[in-house]
């Protein structure tokens, strides 16, 4: 009778050991699978850690242009409105924590785009100054030239196809494709890519320059387009909209401006292309934020 008793005891002990081993293995699996912080280690490793994102601010400077781009601690300012807006621009930049400007871009030598640049150069250290020209008879641009000389800045004309990094974003020069006698068509045309999002800036480029960029096969696809020449009927043509396929457009113009910007023809084309439009004359300053996938817009006031 003693042998059966020993057998039942041995079976019970083996069963208990099996249960304990299973519990230990399960516990170890949970520990190493979840990680010490309780997160899911495989998913966390597969998800890239985002940077600070890209913020694009279309500043309301009346009848002019000024766009601030901030990405991962770096800053680019495209144009700087008219001279009368200089204090507004420099004050806004300081409010946004801007200490220096990595790239200052003058799309072309017209006062409503470069009028405030003299003050910007005086107020902030500028690392690189890009422009579509190095000299001009335009008085506002001549003041930019003198300010650049005082700051020991070289005005550089970037070539088509040139790229440079703005934090995690990439800026590509798409135009002008050649030299134009028309100052508007001489505008720098830039595409800014951040993750899967893209922004297109055309300055005051008109149909001829737009057509040459498209004929050259440049990639103009974008989520957000800044309408050319303040919404003039001579810019942001159907072909550009077809190739770019933007979801949003921002028009920078002054309320009740003497030019009638934005023109009805332009607004009609944007409607036909099913583009959501923001206007600085109606919405004030427009801010677009990108995390590399999603876009969000905030405006200073309701349109």
Specify the residue positions occupied by each region the protein language model found.
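Non-globular, low-confidence helical/coil segments that flank catalytic cores
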Residues: 2-303
């Amino acid at each position: 009778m003693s042998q059966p008793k020993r057998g039942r005891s041995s079976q019970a002990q083996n069963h208990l050991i099996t249960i304990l081993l299973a519990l230990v293995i399960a516990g170890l699996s949970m520990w190493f699978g979840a990680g010490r912080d309780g997160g899911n280690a495989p998913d966390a490793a597969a998800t890239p850690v985002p940077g600070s994102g890209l913020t694009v601010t279309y500043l309301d400077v009346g009848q002019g242009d000024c766009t601030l781009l901030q990405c991962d601690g770096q800053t680019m300012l495209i144009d700087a409105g008219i001279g009368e807006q200089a204090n507004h621009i420099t004050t806004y930049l300081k409010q946004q924590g801007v200490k220096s400007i990595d790239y200052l871009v003058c799309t072309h030598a017209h006062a409503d785009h470069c009028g405030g640049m003299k003050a910007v150069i005086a107020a902030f250290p500028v690392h690189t100054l890009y422009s579509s020209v190095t000299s001009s008879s335009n008085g506002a641009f001549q003041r930019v030239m003198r300010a650049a000389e005082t700051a020991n800045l070289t005005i550089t004309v970037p070539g088509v196809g040139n790229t440079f990094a703005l934090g995690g974003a990439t800026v590509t020069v798409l135009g002008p494709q050649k030299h134009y006698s028309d100052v508007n068509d001489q505008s720098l045309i830039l595409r800014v890519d951040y993750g899967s999002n893209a922004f297109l800036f055309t300055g005051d480029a008109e149909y001829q320059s737009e057509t040459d960029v498209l004929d050259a096969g440049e990639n103009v696809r974008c989520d957000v387009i800044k309408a050319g020449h303040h919404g003039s009927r001579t810019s942001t043509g159907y072909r550009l909209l077809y190739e770019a396929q933007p979801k949003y457009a921002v028009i920078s113009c002054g309320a009740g401006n003497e030019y009638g910007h934005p023109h009805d023809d332009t607004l009609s084309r944007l409607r036909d292309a099913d583009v959501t439009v923001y206007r600085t004359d109606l919405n004030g300053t427009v801010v677009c934020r990108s995390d590399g996938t999603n876009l969000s817009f905030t405006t200073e006031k309701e349109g």
